[in-house]
């Protein structure tokens, strides 16, 4: 596993949004020694199938799963996530949604969703960064 590699796995069905998403990824300030890889997911049967395929193609320790219309405007957001993982060694996933307990079903609806919002956002957004590989499945 590539310890200092970060894979951005992005579902794409609109190239204009994807290009803007890439613009912000390319402006991120990654910690020294870290590299970014981008895995666009196009024409997958489902978002879950697409994420699983891209996850298996990458050996990056950290994988950022996101939609094409998410723009990472805070240039240090990856550093914040890496610091969070360092401070919380048992954490394996962080992002827009989270839970205070583990569900064997891996279903947010059964796991008790909680969230902490750093900034107000409008619209539907999806960004999750994982330190460990977990298969995605339909809820």
PLM regions with names:
Residues 1-27:
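N-proximal low-complexity "stem/linker" segments adjacent to membrane-targeting elements
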Residues 22, 52, 60, 74-86:
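Short alpha-helix within the catalytic core of nucleotide-sugar-dependent glycosyltransferases
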Residues 34-46:
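A short beta-strand-loop structural module common to alpha/beta enzyme folds
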Residues 44, 76-113:
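Conserved donor NDP-sugar-binding/catalytic core segment of glycosyltransferases
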Residues 44-58:
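Glycine-rich, basic loop-to-helix element that forms the pyrophosphate-binding segment
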Residues 63:
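Short aromatic/hydrophobic "clamp" motif used to bind/position activated sugar donors
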Residues 67-71:
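The conserved acidic donor/metal-binding loop of glycosyltransferases
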Residues 113-139:
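Short, flexible, basic/aromatic active-site loop/helix in glycosyltransferases
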């Amino acid at each position: 596993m590539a310890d200092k590699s970060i894979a951005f796995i992005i579902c794409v069905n609109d190239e204009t949004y994807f290009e803007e998403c890439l613009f912000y990824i390319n402006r991120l300030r990654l910690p020294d020694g870290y590299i970014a890889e981008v895995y666009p997911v196009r024409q997958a049967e489902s978002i879950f199938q697409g994420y699983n395929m891209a996850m298996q193609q990458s050996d990056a320790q950290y994988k950022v799963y996101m939609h094409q219309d998410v723009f990472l405007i805070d240039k240090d957001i990856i550093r914040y996530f890496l610091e969070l993982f360092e401070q919380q060694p048992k954490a394996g996933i962080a992002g827009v949604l989270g839970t205070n307990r583990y569900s064997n079903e891996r279903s947010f609806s059964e796991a008790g969703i909680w969230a902490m919002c750093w900034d107000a956002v409008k619209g539907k957004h999806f960004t999750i960064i994982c330190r460990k590989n977990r298969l995605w499945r339909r809820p």
